[in-house]
Amino acid sequence: MDKYGLIGYPLGHSFSKGYFNEKFENEGIDAQYINFEIPSIEDLTEILDSNPELKGLNVTIPYKEKVISYLDQVSPEANAIGAVNVVKVEHKGDETILKGYNSDVIGFTQSIEPFIESFHKKTLILGTGGASKAINYGLKSLGLETVFVSRYERPGTIQYDKITPEVIKEYNVIVNCTPVGMYPHVDECPPLPYEAMDTHTLLYDLIYNPDETLFMKKGKERGATVKNGLEMLLLQAFASWDFWQEEK
């Protein structure tokens, strides 16, 4: 039986495990998907050694960047992004070859593109973690300018207290890559001047639990178009499977 899995820490609820095991059952695929909750990326070697049937891994927080040093090959896109969330495991004789890809950028780009209008030129990306790198790459591929927003002063970022109503009017696409507002903290939202939002504003939240975050709700009240991260999650899962099944 082939094995696939997810590495990260902590894992808690995993969409991928439920999705793939249901897929395997429904499609008669002799495989299982396992959560590998590892406190250190160094534990990856042990997982590979003790699971010779392993064909592929998804990678989540906090290892999307750290996993790269363990890989034999990285796709040009994942290399440019600087983050990997899909690993293909190939066995050639006694040798194990690890290939890294990024399906986050595929899922995000495909899911936001239908909502981009001609008046959407500039984007605020909330957060600076591994997911935000893929989001930045995807937005630029769609022709949008991007600026990162952080709680801390970092090169190439602006802080939340610098986001005025004027900034919101200019940067009218806002993508939340932070966990702020995720269940169970549903009464929290990024500190933004929501009153400046209008029908030209597009809010995209990578969070999918709850279905509508407070970030989305407050924007919607001002006429903004809003979207959560569930479709991105599904599309990146489709892309993960495609990467694992490639014959190359």
Language-model regions, residue ranges each:
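Rossmann-like adenosine-cofactor binding region
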Residues: 156-227, 231
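A short helix->loop->beta-strand "cap" motif at the edges of active sites that frequently abuts
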Residues: 87, 91-95, 144, 198-201, ...
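Active-site capping/gating segments
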Residues: 110-111, 225-248
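Phosphate/diphosphate ligand-binding glycine-rich loop within oxidoreductases
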Residues: 2-115
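Conserved beta-strand positions in the Rossmann-like core of class I SAM-dependent methyltransferases
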Residues: 34, 124, 147
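Glycine-rich adenosine-cofactor-binding loop
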Residues: 8, 102-105, 112, 116, ...
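NAD(P)-binding Rossmann-fold cofactor-contacting core
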Residues: 141-159
